Swiss-Prot record:
Species assigned in the record: Cronobacter sakazakii (strain ATCC BAA-894)
InterPro entries (UniProt xref): DNA_gyrase_inhibitor_YacG, Znf_NHR/GATA
Protein known as: DNA gyrase inhibitor YacG
Subunit structure: Interacts with GyrB.
Task of the protein: Inhibits all the catalytic activities of DNA gyrase by preventing its interaction with DNA. Acts by binding directly to the C-terminal domain of GyrB, which probably disrupts DNA binding by the gyrase.
Amino acid sequence: MMSDATIVNCPTCGKEVIWGEKSPFRPFCSKRCQLIDLGEWAAEEKRIPSSGDRSDTDGWSEEENQP
């Protein structure tokens, strides 16, 4: 009997990955691909789009929020 395993593509290299406990780095195919993705986020090569720019004058500054 065949299981209906969900298969996704690795976001880094595109290799097929079975979504399950046998794939500990899911959705990535390997630790290497996982670290490449993390590095891209850390280097700000990837980002979540926003509708506007935030600056320290928008009330997000840590200095303004301290007692």
